[in-house]
C-alpha cells in the first residue's frame, strides 16, 4: 500500500515490516496503519539495461511494437469516488515523479524501439493544480525529441486548459480514458466524484479543437447508487452531444 519499493526491499533483506502500510498474511490488521500517508520517495528511472541483463526476454517482449509500455509520472489520487480503491492502494497524497527521471525512462524505451507509452497514473491530471506539472512534463518530452510516439492515459477531462490540450495533441496523445460513470449529475454527486458533466464535455470539445481525432474510451457504470430508468438514458444523450 503506497510505495511498494521500500516494502519489497525490506522483504528481500528479511527486515521488519512493523511500520509499513501493508497487510501481512496470518496476522491481524493493525489499527489505523492503513490510513497513514505513505512516505514520499523520489522515483528514479527504471534501468532497462540492467533489466535486460537479468531478463533476456525483454527485447522479445518489446519486438511487436504495437502496444503501450507503462511509465508512471505520479502516484496517489486526491478524490473521494465511492467505488474506487486508488486512495487506499496509493493514498490521497499526490507524489510527482521528477520530470527528468520520467523522460529518462521514456528515452531508454524509445531507444529500444518503443513508440507507445501508457502513463499508469491513477489520474494523469488529478486536479487543476497539477495542470502546470502536466505541461512541464509534455514540454520536456518535446524537448527530448521523442518524435513519432503515441501515448495514452486515464484523465479527468475537467482538468484541462487550451494550452495543455494543445500540448497533449502535439506530443502524440492517441487515446485517453475518462470515467464519466453516469450521465446524471445527481448520481455523479452521490458517488462523490467531484466534477461537472458540462465541464467534461467542454474539455472534450477543447481537445477536438486542438486537433485530437483519435480514440476515447468512456467508462459508464450501470446500476450505481439510486440508478433509475431515466438516469440510465442520460449517458446516451450526453454522448450524442
Where do the protein language model's features map onto the residues?
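Conserved SAM/AdoMet-binding glycine-rich loop
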Residues: 99-217, 222-225
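Catalytic cores of alpha/beta
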Residues: 164, 226-239
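Short, low-complexity, polar/charged sequence segments that are solvent-exposed and flexible
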Residues: 18-19, 90-91, 138-139, 170-173, ...
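Short, intrinsically disordered, charge-balanced linker/junction segments flanking boundaries
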Residues: 2-4, 8-11, 169, 201, ...
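Donor nucleotide-sugar recognition loop
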Residues: 78, 91-97, 192-198, 229-230
Amino acid at each position: 500500500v503506497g510505495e511498494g519499493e521500500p516494502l519489497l526491499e525490506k522483504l528481500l533483506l528479511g527486515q521488519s515490516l512493523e511500520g509499513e502500510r501493508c497487510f501481512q498474511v496470518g496476522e491481524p490488521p493493525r489499527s489505523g496503519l492503513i490510513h497513514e500517508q505513505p512516505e514520499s520517495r523520489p522515483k528514479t528511472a527504471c534501468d532497462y539495461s540492467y533489466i535486460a541483463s537479468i531478463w533476456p526476454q525483454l527485447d522479445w517482449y518489446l519486438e511487436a511494437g504495437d502496444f503501450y509500455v507503462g511509465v508512471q509520472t505520479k502516484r496517489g489520487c486526491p478524490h473521494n469516488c465511492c467505488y474506487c480503491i486508488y486512495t487506499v492502494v496509493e493514498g490521497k497524497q499526490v507524489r510527482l515523479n521528477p520530470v527528468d527521471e520520467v523522460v529518462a525512462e521514456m528515452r531508454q524505451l524509445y531507444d529500444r524501439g518503443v513508440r507507445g507509452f501508457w502513463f499508469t497514473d491513477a489520474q494523469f491530471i488529478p486536479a487543476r493544480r497539477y495542470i502546470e506539472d502536466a505541461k512541464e512534463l509534455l514540454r520536456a518530452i518535446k524537448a527530448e525529441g521523442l518524435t513519432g510516439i503515441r501515448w495514452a492515459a486515464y484523465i479527468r477531462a475537467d482538468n484541462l486548459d487550451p494550452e495543455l490540450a494543445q500540448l497533449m495533441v502535439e506530443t502524440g496523445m492517441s487515446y485517453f480514458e475518462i470515467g464519466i460513470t453516469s450521465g446524471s449529475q445527481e448520481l455523479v454527486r452521490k458517488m462523490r466524484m467531484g466534477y461537472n458533466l458540462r465541464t467534461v464535455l467542454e474539455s472534450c470539445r477543447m481537445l477536438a479543437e486542438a486537433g485530437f481525432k483519435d480514440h476515447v474510451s468512456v467508462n459508464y457504470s450501470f446500476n450505481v447508487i439510486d440508478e433509475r430508468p431515466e438516469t440510465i438514458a442520460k449517458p446516451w444523450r450526453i454522448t450524442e452531444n
